[in-house]
Amino acid sequence: MAQAQIGTPLLTTRQAEELHKSILAYLSSKNLASTAATLRDELPDLAEVTFDTEKAKKYEGLLEKKWTSVVRLQKKILDLESRNTLLQSEIDNATPSSLSRRTQDPTNWLPKAPPRYVLESHRLPVTCVAFHPVFTSLASGSEDYTIKIWDWELGELERTIKGHTKAVLDVDFGGPRGGTLLASCSSDLTIKLWDPSDEYKNIRTLPGHDHIVSSVRFIPSGAAGAPASGNLLVSASKDNSLKIWDVTTGYCVKTILGHVDWPRAVCPSHDGRYLLSTGSDKSVRLWDLAGGRDAECRLVMFGHENYNLCCAFAPPTAYAYLAKLAGLDRPPPLGASAEFMATGSRDKQIRLWDGRGNCVKVLVGHDNWVRGLVFHPGGKYLLSVADDRTMRCWDLSQEGKCVQTLTGVYEGFVSCIRWAPPVVKDADAMAANTKSGGTGPLADTVVAARRRAATVGSVNASVQIRCVVATGSVDGTEGKVRIFAN
């Protein structure tokens, strides 16, 4: 009977070589020459290894970084185990009424005060936030020139990213098949790409705009004429242009002109076919990317009386509610995109538009500039934040009635709002993602499932709404990020 092999290696040959080089670099940095020489003698793969300047920089401090990463991971595991024990205790001792609160329908969940966490570290106002599509990571950008990465589940700061030389104005996660990237844009006229799988290393800088870059978004794959890999990024700038970039090459593949003043915000439709842009010329423009080389401006909408600051496409889950506002006999097909849109402005108003360019509703209630908008994934609500220090929730099933106003939570202007992407419950997809470390083709299963859910306009059995909202604000002179969660 064959015996089990003893000492089966846990690392691949390449991983072992990298570990050996890291140990050698560590010993060399500590001036332990004899120990390093002994290691070279006993490990054949190190015999010919020499460290030039570039290679030394690559391995310098790598062992320490890996060690501290393991320590942080162990702490997270302990914290999660503690939370799991607490939740299990709550379930064991729960009454039927408390269980019903726990299992409330996520399509009706709205953020409540107080927030779960108030995250403090930025020295100046927070301008933007973005959720990682898979992990519990949140990026925030600030006028202090930095990006900070938080674990929103634990309420902890993970790292500070430096690279921009002026205010960071927008951030977004996305990217090509095989790995999620973080994109950022700034008043320094550049867009930067960061790799979350490599300690958020700056892998590319995209110059090309001639003025402030105020908005950046990854374009979902599936657009007609767009690569299936999802490697396109759109940006908006004070140079009056929109630009589309290929993040794998760093080249600008399309410049879109039409705005006569600063297009402050841009967002793509869920299928990547359309772009919505708006800004200081008070116009709202709908662009069709299906035409190939040139983007076609399908609609130009006017109605706001001051600069427009934000825009959003309605998800298909909202079509049934918005169709009634638009006076339609039946809602558009769930597979359609760009059927309804929302914009917010310095005129303190939010306007809802249909796909024919008609303003179907004006939402009035904010007392100052409307800075950010996000549709509830369930489609029933629209959330907004403004310089009046409030977050408002508008019920689209009640003709856009404001059904909730969060006051007393913020000490200053509220600049941005994002909703966490849904959870993929499919066991195979999650297992695949875990094995691939959140990158690679297996991880794409998770992202693809979310896109399918958006396309069909409903949250199916394998995709669940995540009741987590993040906002950014200025409190005094400092910026704060607030996490609202169920």
UniProtKB/Swiss-Prot annotation:
Which residue spans adopt a coiled-coil conformation according to this UniProt entry?
70-95
Q: Where is the LisH domain?
A: 15-47
Offer a single GO CC term for the protein.
Answer: cytoplasm
This molecule's function is given as: Positively regulates the activity of the minus-end directed microtubule motor protein dynein. May enhance dynein-mediated microtubule sliding by targeting dynein to the microtubule plus end. Required for nuclear migration during vegetative growth as well as development. Required for retrograde early endosome (EE) transport from the hyphal tip. Required for localization of dynein to the mitotic spindle poles. Recruits additional proteins to the dynein complex at SPBs.
Task: Provide the assembly information.
Answer: Self-associates. Interacts with NDL1 and dynein.
Q: Which SMART domains match?
A: WD40
Protein name, UniProt field: Nuclear distribution protein PAC1-2
Taxonomically, what lineage is the organism? Eukaryota, Fungi, Dikarya, Ascomycota, Pezizomycotina
Tell me which InterPro entries the record gives: Dynein_regulator_LIS1, G-protein_beta_WD-40_rep, LIS1_N, LisH, PAC1-like_LisH-like_dom, WD40/YVTN_repeat-like_dom_sf, WD40_repeat_CS, WD40_repeat_dom_sf
Primary localisation category: cytoplasm
Q: Please provide the record's free-text comment about the domains of this protein.
A: Dimerization mediated by the LisH domain may be required to activate dynein.
Could you tell me the keywords of this UniProt record? Cell cycle, Cell division, Coiled coil, Cytoplasm, Cytoskeleton, Microtubule, Mitosis, Repeat, Transport, WD repeat
Q: Name one GO biological process term.
A: establishment of mitotic spindle orientation
**Known Pfam families for this protein?**
LisH_PAC1, WD40
| Each WD repeat, start to end | 121-162, 164-204, 208-255, 258-297, 303-363, 365-404, 446-485
Q: Name one GO molecular function term.
A: dynein complex binding
